[in-house]
Amino acid sequence: MCFNYNALQEHIEKIKESFDFVSITSIGKGWCKRSIYSLSIGEGETSVLFLADFSDTAGITSEILLTFFERLCVAYKNDLKISAVKIRSILREQKIVIVPITNPDGLEISCSDGENALCYKGLVQRAADNNFSEWISNARGVEIGKNFPYRFSDTKSIMKNSSAFGYKGPFEASELETQAIISFCKAINPKYTITLSCSGEYISCQCSKCASDCAMMTQVFKSVSGLPIKRIKPCEAYGSFGGWFSKSFSAPSFCFSVSKRSVADLKSLYDKYEELLLLSSIM
């Protein structure tokens, strides 16, 4: 069973009731009017932004981020440590912000075999050809991870029209989800970003004018996690969030990729990545 939009809302409501110091905001909506939420904790002026995978329609990266955020909240509230780090001290200096679902409509479409696509149901069924096992697009059949305004014209689009995957969209930032993430980044100006992915275990970094910082941080993350470093080919960055962010903000955009498992494996996955997530939030 996948982690769906209702489960996200229930989790957010639980956090809201338990931790009154958390800031929860809807930063935008998908085409089916499902909100894209951000959750923030901390008192500092600077922030680190974590995002769930744009193509994770099983909710694995969403669950990992929410578990991490809730652990931070408990430690902050009770003045506890995580991996020998005193969380309250860290969060007096900066904010940690998460966007636990970046493609809420895609998540629902995948989980419901297209039934929850609302007015886009017909489009979605045609685009998927009734096979939703590979669905990672939004309600208009656009793959969000290819829709960002970074060398968009050079971005390869496997599909020419709405599809379960591979269609970059009619023009750059054409999608509501893309626009919401862009506007949010401009509003909070994070010092760097970390996207969780579900495409095998590795660490990668995109940067345009901060190569030395990027290389140093990536090596530290590798030494802590034991994960290999993946070199991103220039063509792989076209249309991507990481390519857009690093170019627009002259700051690193990291990707921590996990193996694609079921949500039932959450604990073992989370335990493996907690120290890496914590370190990446305080550097």
Language model feature labels by segment:
Residues M1-I36:
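Short glycine- and acidic-rich boundary segments immediately preceding or forming the N-terminal edge
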Residues Y37-T46:
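Short beta-strand-to-loop junctions in surface cap/lid or active-site-entrance loops
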Residues D154-M283:
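Metallocarboxypeptidase
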Residues E45, A58-I60, L65-C207, A211-C214:
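Active-site/substrate-binding loop(s) of hydrolase catalytic cores
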Residues T46-F50, I96, F254:
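Generic beta-sheet signal
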Residues I24-I27, D79-I87, R231-K233:
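Surface-exposed patches in mature extracellular/periplasmic domains of secreted proteins
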Residues I24, S38, I98, G141-E143, ...:
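Conserved beta-strand scaffold positions in the cores of enzyme catalytic domains, especially
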Residues S26-K29, L51-F54, V99-P104, K146-P149, ...:
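Active-site-proximal beta-strand/loop segments in catalytic clefts of secreted hydrolases
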